[in-house]
Amino acid sequence: MPTHPAARTNSERQNWPREVKARAPQRIFLLSPANASGVRAKMIMSENARFVLARRLRNDGLPLGELFSFVSGLYFRGKLAYARAFASPPGGVPGILVITAGRGLVSPDALMTHDEMAEIADVPVDAGEARYREPLERDAQE
């Protein structure tokens, strides 16, 4: 049974004929931020944490999507999986961006270091907070 066209992966869509691509709906996903100051965030940020993700975060960094998937658990992981399956952006535009506190719109594939995650955790997710709102407004205008 063929899958619905919207469920096809981005790589499958790249092989479509030009006239089919022109009619295909375009979708960009903005994913809401994870709670970077919650229990799971504190767990991965702890200098005493010895599990693999915490060590990777401290050493080379983690992709934001992987980091927020751990911090938020199934909620963010599900949103990210859905966005990866159904994103269909116009050319030259990323299909998925994550709203981050203090950093604006960031690709889920961007590496985040321990220090960068600490900076994110320091900014409240609050539209009244300039450190949260201004980077988001800046990136939304680009």
Predicted regions and their residues:
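Peripheral peptide segments
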Residues: 2-142
